[in-house]
Amino acid sequence: ISFYSKYEIIEKGSIPFVSNGDAMYADVMVKGKRIRFVNVYLEPFQLHKSMVKPTSDLDENGAKAKSLVRRFMPVFKKHEEQVQILKNFIEKSPYPVILAGDFNSVPNSYEYYTISGVLKDCFLESGTGLATSFHDYKIPIRIDYVFSSENLKSTHYQVDRSQKLSDHYPVLVKFSLKD
Protein backbone atom coordinates (compact mmCIF):
# COMPACT_ATOMS: atom_id res chain seq x y z
CA ILE A 1 0.00 0.00 0.00
CA SER A 2 1.14 3.57 -0.58
CA PHE A 3 0.13 7.22 -0.62
CA TYR A 4 0.28 9.77 -3.42
CA SER A 5 -0.76 13.36 -2.73
CA LYS A 6 -0.72 16.68 -4.50
CA TYR A 7 -0.82 18.22 -1.02
CA GLU A 8 2.06 18.39 1.43
CA ILE A 9 2.58 15.24 3.51
CA ILE A 10 3.52 16.41 7.02
CA GLU A 11 4.08 13.04 8.65
CA LYS A 12 3.76 9.39 7.66
CA GLY A 13 4.24 6.01 9.24
CA SER A 14 3.11 2.42 9.47
CA ILE A 15 0.57 0.90 11.80
CA PRO A 16 2.06 -2.40 12.94
CA PHE A 17 0.10 -5.58 12.25
CA VAL A 18 1.42 -9.00 13.26
CA SER A 19 0.36 -10.83 10.10
CA ASN A 20 -0.01 -10.46 6.33
CA GLY A 21 -2.19 -7.35 6.51
CA ASP A 22 -0.76 -3.87 6.25
CA ALA A 23 -1.71 -0.35 7.32
CA MET A 24 -0.08 3.03 7.11
CA TYR A 25 -1.01 6.65 7.69
CA ALA A 26 -0.10 10.04 6.27
CA ASP A 27 -0.95 13.44 7.71
CA VAL A 28 -1.67 15.81 4.85
CA MET A 29 -2.24 19.58 4.88
CA VAL A 30 -5.35 20.35 2.84
CA LYS A 31 -6.29 24.03 2.60
CA GLY A 32 -4.62 24.75 5.94
CA LYS A 33 -6.23 21.81 7.74
CA ARG A 34 -4.30 18.70 8.80
CA ILE A 35 -6.08 15.47 7.88
CA ARG A 36 -4.91 11.96 8.76
CA PHE A 37 -5.29 9.47 5.90
CA VAL A 38 -5.12 5.79 6.80
CA ASN A 39 -4.69 3.12 4.13
CA VAL A 40 -5.40 -0.49 5.11
CA TYR A 41 -5.21 -3.99 3.69
CA LEU A 42 -6.60 -6.55 6.14
CA GLU A 43 -5.39 -10.14 6.17
CA PRO A 44 -6.34 -11.85 2.88
CA PHE A 45 -8.28 -15.11 2.75
CA GLN A 46 -6.10 -16.34 -0.13
CA LEU A 47 -8.94 -18.07 -1.90
CA HIS A 48 -8.73 -19.57 -5.35
CA LYS A 49 -11.65 -19.82 -7.74
CA SER A 50 -11.63 -23.62 -7.57
CA MET A 51 -12.24 -23.41 -3.80
CA VAL A 52 -15.58 -21.64 -4.20
CA LYS A 53 -16.80 -22.98 -7.54
CA PRO A 54 -19.65 -25.47 -6.97
CA THR A 55 -19.69 -28.83 -8.73
CA SER A 56 -22.46 -31.32 -9.44
CA ASP A 57 -21.10 -33.60 -6.67
CA LEU A 58 -22.85 -32.77 -3.38
CA ASP A 59 -20.21 -34.56 -1.30
CA GLU A 60 -17.45 -32.56 -2.96
CA ASN A 61 -19.38 -29.33 -2.37
CA GLY A 62 -19.81 -30.26 1.30
CA ALA A 63 -16.08 -30.93 1.63
CA LYS A 64 -15.33 -27.57 -0.02
CA ALA A 65 -17.64 -25.79 2.39
CA LYS A 66 -15.96 -27.39 5.42
CA SER A 67 -12.55 -26.52 4.01
CA LEU A 68 -13.59 -22.89 3.55
CA VAL A 69 -14.84 -22.65 7.13
CA ARG A 70 -11.50 -24.02 8.41
CA ARG A 71 -9.68 -21.47 6.25
CA PHE A 72 -11.89 -18.56 7.35
CA MET A 73 -11.65 -18.96 11.12
CA PRO A 74 -7.95 -18.02 11.59
CA VAL A 75 -8.35 -15.09 9.17
CA PHE A 76 -11.36 -13.78 11.09
CA LYS A 77 -9.28 -13.93 14.28
CA LYS A 78 -6.49 -11.91 12.62
CA HIS A 79 -9.06 -9.41 11.35
CA GLU A 80 -10.34 -8.96 14.90
CA GLU A 81 -6.82 -8.11 16.10
CA GLN A 82 -6.10 -5.81 13.14
CA VAL A 83 -9.39 -3.93 13.47
CA GLN A 84 -8.82 -3.35 17.19
CA ILE A 85 -5.38 -1.88 16.39
CA LEU A 86 -6.97 0.37 13.74
CA LYS A 87 -9.81 1.43 16.05
CA ASN A 88 -7.36 2.38 18.82
CA PHE A 89 -5.20 4.30 16.34
CA ILE A 90 -8.21 6.21 14.99
CA GLU A 91 -9.54 7.05 18.45
CA LYS A 92 -6.15 8.51 19.45
CA SER A 93 -5.84 10.67 16.33
CA PRO A 94 -5.77 14.40 17.10
CA TYR A 95 -6.81 15.07 13.47
CA PRO A 96 -9.85 14.21 11.33
CA VAL A 97 -9.40 10.78 9.73
CA ILE A 98 -10.12 9.33 6.30
CA LEU A 99 -9.72 5.54 6.36
CA ALA A 100 -9.73 3.63 3.07
CA GLY A 101 -8.76 0.21 1.88
CA ASP A 102 -9.40 -3.45 1.31
CA PHE A 103 -11.04 -4.84 4.44
CA ASN A 104 -11.69 -8.30 2.97
CA SER A 105 -15.01 -8.12 4.85
CA VAL A 106 -18.62 -7.56 3.88
CA PRO A 107 -20.86 -4.79 5.33
CA ASN A 108 -22.54 -7.06 7.91
CA SER A 109 -19.19 -8.13 9.42
CA TYR A 110 -17.48 -7.53 12.75
CA GLU A 111 -14.83 -5.49 10.92
CA TYR A 112 -17.38 -3.13 9.37
CA TYR A 113 -19.44 -2.84 12.55
CA THR A 114 -16.37 -1.98 14.66
CA ILE A 115 -14.99 0.69 12.31
CA SER A 116 -18.42 2.21 11.62
CA GLY A 117 -18.68 2.72 15.37
CA VAL A 118 -15.86 5.30 15.25
CA LEU A 119 -16.08 6.61 11.66
CA LYS A 120 -18.91 7.06 9.17
CA ASP A 121 -19.23 5.06 5.96
CA CYS A 122 -18.84 7.52 3.09
CA PHE A 123 -20.93 5.35 0.76
CA LEU A 124 -23.94 5.75 3.06
CA GLU A 125 -23.40 9.51 3.07
CA SER A 126 -22.88 10.18 -0.64
CA GLY A 127 -23.05 6.96 -2.66
CA THR A 128 -25.73 5.32 -4.76
CA GLY A 129 -26.21 1.82 -6.10
CA LEU A 130 -24.41 -1.22 -4.72
CA ALA A 131 -20.79 -0.02 -4.27
CA THR A 132 -19.50 -3.50 -5.10
CA SER A 133 -15.80 -3.21 -5.82
CA PHE A 134 -14.46 -6.78 -5.87
CA HIS A 135 -15.20 -8.53 -9.15
CA ASP A 136 -12.86 -11.48 -9.52
CA TYR A 137 -15.14 -14.44 -8.70
CA LYS A 138 -18.18 -13.19 -10.62
CA ILE A 139 -19.74 -12.58 -7.22
CA PRO A 140 -19.93 -8.80 -6.84
CA ILE A 141 -19.27 -7.97 -3.21
CA ARG A 142 -18.36 -4.87 -1.26
CA ILE A 143 -15.11 -5.34 0.66
CA ASP A 144 -13.40 -2.01 -0.08
CA TYR A 145 -14.47 0.97 2.03
CA VAL A 146 -13.86 4.63 2.67
CA PHE A 147 -14.74 5.92 6.14
CA SER A 148 -14.30 9.41 7.58
CA SER A 149 -14.58 11.45 10.75
CA GLU A 150 -17.83 13.32 11.38
CA ASN A 151 -16.27 16.71 10.61
CA LEU A 152 -15.45 15.65 7.04
CA LYS A 153 -18.30 15.43 4.52
CA SER A 154 -18.18 13.12 1.53
CA THR A 155 -19.94 14.73 -1.41
CA HIS A 156 -19.46 12.04 -4.06
CA TYR A 157 -18.78 8.29 -3.85
CA GLN A 158 -18.19 6.18 -6.95
CA VAL A 159 -16.84 2.75 -7.84
CA ASP A 160 -15.15 3.19 -11.22
CA ARG A 161 -16.03 0.01 -13.09
CA SER A 162 -14.35 1.27 -16.26
CA GLN A 163 -10.90 0.64 -14.73
CA LYS A 164 -9.82 -2.99 -14.21
CA LEU A 165 -6.51 -2.33 -12.49
CA SER A 166 -6.70 -5.48 -10.33
CA ASP A 167 -9.40 -7.76 -8.93
CA HIS A 168 -10.84 -4.62 -7.28
CA TYR A 169 -12.32 -1.58 -8.99
CA PRO A 170 -11.06 1.81 -7.76
CA VAL A 171 -13.26 3.65 -5.26
CA LEU A 172 -13.33 7.44 -5.69
CA VAL A 173 -14.62 9.79 -3.00
CA LYS A 174 -14.78 13.60 -2.94
CA PHE A 175 -14.85 15.51 0.34
CA SER A 176 -15.65 18.97 1.57
CA LEU A 177 -14.18 20.30 4.79
CA LYS A 178 -16.68 21.26 7.48
CA ASP A 179 -15.77 24.10 9.83
Where are these regions (language model features)?
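Short acidic/polar alpha-helix capping motifs at helix-coil junctions
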Residues: 50-53, 77, 123
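Structured beta-strand-rich core segments of catalytic domains in phosphoester-bond hydrolases
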Residues: 1-50, 146, 158, 162
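A solvent-exposed, charged loop/short amphipathic helix patch at secondary-structure junctions
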Residues: 51-72
